[in-house]
From Swiss-Prot:
Exhibits a very high intrinsic GTPase hydrolysis rate. Involved in the addition of a carboxymethylaminomethyl (cmnm) group at the wobble position (U34) of certain tRNAs, forming tRNA-cmnm(5)s(2)U34. CDD domains: trmE (cd04164), TrmE_N (cd14858). It comes from Pseudothermotoga lettingae (strain ATCC BAA-301 / DSM 14385 / NBRC 107922 / TMO). The lineage of its organism: Bacteria, Thermotogati, Thermotogota, Thermotogae, Thermotogales. The gene is mnmE. This is tRNA modification GTPase MnmE. Its main location: cytoplasm.
Length: 450
């Protein structure tokens, strides 16, 4: 029988209330042992009481709710204790429950038990974590549909359809001398399944980018003001700023919110030819970050003419989406605009700013939003994790292989095997086929108490 687990479910800190959650077969027994008054309980009804410690001293006035198995979040007997939201009082109640036999919960253990007890599948479990971590309204909307079970519902229906198709194929295989099903119908059902998967996957990469934060990479040669720009955009000192070129050697990643859209802003080492081994590593990382970014802010220094280092950087990013940012316009402007236009071409966005004086920053933010509009707009759908994407893409490939085998009139057991492999990918997506390692990876980053 699983241990009875306990954890604080609300953020640690001072607030109006804290919630302590306990799940397992001994939940009510342990709870009774710490309550001042013996109470007759009704499931899902809050009641008033006091929590006492082992010597009978009252710790706090509380409200308690009991959830009877299987009608609870975890599918087990569950208790929620709502106490005053102080750090000391909440921890004291938690310690008292542990001293009476409850075990401190691991990260995500309540949701893991909900999955293992059949209350949710893995798509819903992932949605729980994502809605807690969502940093923008757009991401909340994307994830909420899966929390309500939309992706799960669609994929379960797809699974049922494929099971029916597999049954038709296996009947043909078992009775080869009889024509029991129109071959065209089998092929059509497989094609329809592929079309359905493609509809689910449509714009999925954009949704994954949006949910994790659109990557905006700041690049340029040393001492052009990249770190100052990062600090100005995030409105705090996150990167070290000095007049010494090459101060930034490693990537600095900072979350940024603009108009409710979540970004990850990345400051990089200045790109130039160098014999310094550490600086060379920083330059390599900067180039790699630019290659992986969704948008580049290419920073030029208004106080120095465009040189070969600038041109080299431009050659590295010319296939990417980028904005040219001329910084330090509060000082002497030595950049020849006509020469710059020849180098960049006429369609390149060029903005002038002073990161130090915070001039032109609002216009830059507006241009950033405009530049990623395609990512922001094309986000309808339900795929919100790379794991979901990969299993559905695998399912699509296996179904395509089954159609090819069918068209080539290969033995029907080969066609059936491909459909079974497609179903296997769906089972892994939903979690009906899982390993402990997979669950560990999914739940390890959950907060304790969820």
């Amino acid at each position: 029988m699983p241990d009875t687990i306990v954890a604080i479910s609300t953020p640690i800190g001072t607030g109006a209330i804290s919630v302590i959650r306990m799940s397992g077969s001994k939940s009510w027994q342990i709870c009774q042992n710490v309550l001042l008054r013996k109470t007759k309980i009704e499931p899902r009804k809050a009641f008033h009481n006091y929590v006492k410690d082992s010597d009978g001293t009252i710790l706090d006035e509380v409200m308690v709710i009991f959830y009877k198995s299987p009608n609870s979040y975890t599918g087990e007997d569950m208790i929620e204790i709502m106490c005053h939201g102080g750090i000391a009082v909440t921890q004291s109640i938690l310690d008292t429950l542990i001293s009476h036999g409850a075990r401190p919960a691991e990260p995500g253990e309540f949701t893991r038990r909900a999955f293992l007890n059949g209350k949710i599948d893995l798509t819903k479990a992932e949605a729980v974590k994502q809605i807690i971590e969502a940093s923008s309204r757009k991401t909340v909307k994307l994830v909420a549909a899966n929390l309500a079970g939309r992706l799960s519902e669609i994929v379960h229906k797809l699974r049922e359809t494929l099971l029916g198709t597999l049954a038709k194929i296996e009947v043909e295989f078992d009775y080869p001398d009889e024509i029991l099903t129109d071959p065209y119908l089998i092929e059509k059902e497989l094609n329809d399944a592929i079309l359905q998967i493609e509809e689910i996957l449509k714009n999925a990469q954009n949704r994954l980018i949006l949910s994790s934060g659109i990557k905006v990479v700041i690049i340029g040669k040393p001492n052009v003001g990249k770190s100052t720009l990062l600090n100005t955009l995030v409105k705090e000192e996150r990167a070290i700023v000095t007049d010494i070129p090459g101060t930034t050697r490693d990537l600095i990643e900072v979350p940024l919110m603009i108009n409710g859209i979540s970004f990850t802003l990345i400051d990089t080492a200045g790109i130039r030819h160098s014999h310094d081994e550490v600086e060379k590593i920083g330059v390599e990382r900067a180039i790699k970050a630019a290659d992986e970014g969704n948008l580049i802010l290419f920073v030029l220094d208004a106080t120095t003419p465009v040189d070969e280092n600038d041109k080299k950087i431009l050659s590295l990013i010319k296939e990417k989406k980028y904005i040219v940012v001329i910084n330090k316009i509060d000082a002497t402007d030595l950049i020849d605009r006509e020469e710059l236009k020849k180098i960049l071409g006429t369609n390149t966005h060029v903005l002038t700013i002073s990161a130090l004086k915070k001039e032109g920053i609002q216009r830059l933010e507006e241009e950033i939003i405009k530049s990623v509009k395609d990512l922001i707009q094309q986000t309808d759908g339900y795929i919100t994790t790379q794991r979901q994407y990969e299993y559905l893409a695998s399912c699509r490939k296996e179904l395509s292989d089954s159609i090819e085998a069918f068209k080539k009139k290969l033995p029907l057991d080969i066609v059936a095997q491909k459909v079974k492999e497609a179903l296997g990918s769906i089972d892994k997506l939903l979690g009906t086929d899982y390993t402990d390692d997979l669950l560990d990876r999914i739940f390890k980053d959950f907060c304790v108490g969820k």
